[in-house]
C-alpha cells in the first residue's frame, strides 16, 4: 500500500483539514494519480522484487481498487459533521485530479456501494450524493466530448452500469465514436441490437417473455406492480373514459391490460416483433374497439403520426427491449410533439439498474435531459425488497436494485 493509500485509511482522528487536506494535495501535486490502484501498487512491488509481473490473477486484472475505494472502505462509523466536511473536501480533490466514479474494486464493489454499506444504506447522505454528482458530471462531459453522441460508460466500466436496454452490452459491442452497436457475439447480439432482436424467435412462458434460444429476459411478471402504477399515471390527466394513451412495446401485455381496465377513449399500442404481434392477434387485441395497433418500429410509426399532426396523447409509455439511452433521447424529440401540454410521459426505468450507484446517476441524467425540453421528471419510489425473481430461468438478471424509481415526466 502506498503512502497515498495509507493516508486515506484515516489513521489519525479527528479527521481534520490540517492533517489530511495538505498531505493529500501534496501527493496529488507530486504526480501520484488519483486513480492509482492497489493492483498497480502490487504489480510495481512484484517488479521491484524481480518477480514475474505478468503473473496477475484474474481478479487483479479486472479490479481497480482506487484511492476513493480506500477512503470509502475506511470511513469511521462515528463520523462527525465536521469530519464529514473534511472527507467531502478530500473527495472533491480526488475528483478534481481525475478520480473515477464507477470503478470496481477487488470485492466487485463501487465507491458508492462501500459508502452505502458504511452509512446504513442512506442514499441521501452527502458522501454518497457526492459520488452521484461526480457520475452525472462525468457522463455528461463524456457525451459532450463525443460531439453529442451518447456513449455513457467508458472502457472497463461497461459491465458495471447498463444503459436503457435490459441487458448489459459488452464493451466490444460499442462503436467508439457513437456508442451504437456495431458488432457483438452471437450470445449477446439479441440483447444488444434491435434488428437482431426483431429477427429472433420469442417464447412466452407462464411468467415471462424470453428469447427462445438465449433465454434473454424480455419481460417478466415481477414487473406487474410497476406496470399497474404506470397505467394509473397514463390515465391520471383526464376523467375516466377520456384518456388517449400510447404504449410503446407490448411485451406480455401487462400494462396494456391495466390500461384497458381503466377504459381509455383510445389506446394505441406500438409493437414491432412479429411473434408478439401474432400473440396480440390470437389474444384478441386487434378486435378491441378502442385499440389501435401500430405495427413496426416506433421510429417509423410515431414519426408518421407526428407528420400527420392529428393525434395527441394524454399519456405515453415506453418499454422496449434491446434499445439504449441514445434511443430514448431520440424518443424525447418525438414525445414533446405528441404529448398534450397537460399530458405525461413515462417509461420502464431500468437505466443503470445493475448497481444502485449507476441507477441513481441515471436518475439524475434523465432529469437533466428532459429539462432541456422544458419538462420536469418526478419519481415515485417503489420498494422491491423480496419481489425480484431468482432469475434462474433467464440468461442473466436485468434488474439488481431493491427499489425502483417510477418516472413521471410532464411539461413544467
Swiss-Prot record:
Localisation: Cytoplasm; Nucleus
Family: Belongs to the class I-like SAM-binding methyltransferase superfamily. RMT2 methyltransferase family.
Taxonomic placement: Eukaryota, Fungi, Dikarya, Ascomycota, Saccharomycotina
Gene name, Swiss-Prot/TrEMBL: RMT2
Domain RMT2: start-end pairs: 190-412
Keywords linked to the UniProt accession: Cytoplasm, Methyltransferase, Nucleus, S-adenosyl-L-methionine, Transferase
Protein name: Protein arginine N-methyltransferase 2
Enzyme Commission identifier(s): 2.1.1.-
Role summary: S-adenosyl-L-methionine-dependent protein-arginine N-methyltransferase that methylates the delta-nitrogen atom of arginine residues to form N5-methylarginine (type IV) in target proteins. Monomethylates ribosomal protein L12.
Species of origin: Candida glabrata (strain ATCC 2001 / BCRC 20586 / JCM 3761 / NBRC 0622 / NRRL Y-65 / CBS 138)
Molecular function (Gene Ontology), one example: protein arginine N5-methyltransferase activity
Amino acid at each position: 500500500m502506498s503512502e497515498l493509500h495509507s493516508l486515506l485509511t484515516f489513521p489519525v482522528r479527528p479527521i481534520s483539514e490540517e492533517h489530511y487536506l495538505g498531505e493529500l494535495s501534496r501527493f496529488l501535486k507530486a504526480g501520484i494519480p488519483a486513480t492509482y490502484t492497489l493492483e498497480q501498487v502490487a504489480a510495481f512491488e512484484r517488479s521491484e522484487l524481480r518477480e514475474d509481473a505478468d503473473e496477475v490473477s484474474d481478479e487483479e486484472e479486472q479490479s481497480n481498487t482506487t484511492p476513493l475505494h480506500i477512503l470509502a472502505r475506511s470511513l469511521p462509523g462515528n463520523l462527525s459533521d465536521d469530519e464529514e466536511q473534511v472527507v467531502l473536501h478530500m473527495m472533491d480533490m480526488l475528483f478534481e485530479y481525475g478520480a473515477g466514479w464507477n470503478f470496481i474494486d477487488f470485492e466487485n464493489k463501487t465507491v458508492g456501494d462501500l459508502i452505502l454499506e458504511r452509512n446504513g444504506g442512506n442514499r441521501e447522505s452527502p458522501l454518497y450524493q457526492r459520488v452521484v454528482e461526480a457520475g452525472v458530471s462525468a457522463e455528461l462531459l463524456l457525451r459532450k466530448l463525443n460531439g453529442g453522441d451518447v456513449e455513457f460508460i467508458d472502457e472497463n466500466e461497461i459491465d458495471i452500469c447498463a444503459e436503457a436496454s435490459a441487458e448489459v452490452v459488452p464493451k466490444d459491442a460499442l462503436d467508439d465514436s457513437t456508442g451504437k452497436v456495431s458488432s457483438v457475439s452471437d450470445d449477446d447480439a439479441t440483447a444488444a441490437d434491435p434488428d437482431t432482436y426483431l429477427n429472433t424467435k420469442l417464447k412466452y412462458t407462464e411468467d415471462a417473455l424470453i428469447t427462445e434460444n438465449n433465454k434473454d429476459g424480455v419481460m417478466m411478471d415481477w414487473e406487474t406492480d410497476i406496470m399497474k402504477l404506470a397505467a394509473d399515471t397514463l390515465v391520471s390527466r383526464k376523467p375516466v373514459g377520456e384518456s388517449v394513451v400510447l404504449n410503446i412495446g407490448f411485451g406480455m401485455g401487462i400494462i396494456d391490460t391495466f390500461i384497458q381496465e381503466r377504459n381509455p377513449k383510445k389506446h394505441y399500442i406500438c409493437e414491432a416483433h412479429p411473434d408478439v404481434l401474432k400473440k396480440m392477434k390470437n389474444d384478441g387485441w386487434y378486435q378491441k374497439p378502442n385499440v389501435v395497433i401500430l405495427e413496426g418500429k416506433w421510429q417509423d410509426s410515431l414519426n408518421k403520426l407526428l407528420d400527420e399532426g392529428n393525434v395527441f396523447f394524454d399519456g405515453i409509455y415506453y418499454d422496449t427491449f434491446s434499445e439504449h439511452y441514445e434511443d430514448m433521447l431520440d424518443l424525447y424529440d418525438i414525445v414533446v410533439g405528441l404529448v398534450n401540454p397537460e399530458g405525461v410521459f413515462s417509461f420502464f426505468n431500468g437505466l443503470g439498474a445493475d448497481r444502485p450507484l449507476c441507477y441513481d446517476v441515471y436518475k439524475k441524467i434523465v432529469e437533466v435531459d428532459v429539462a432541456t425540453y422544458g419538462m420536469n421528471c418526478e419519481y415515485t419510489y417503489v420498494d422491491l425488497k423480496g419481489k425480484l425473481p431468482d432469475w434462474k430461468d433467464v440468461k442473466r438478471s436485468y434488474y439488481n436494485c431493491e427499489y425502483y424509481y417510477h418516472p413521471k415526466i410532464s411539461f413544467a
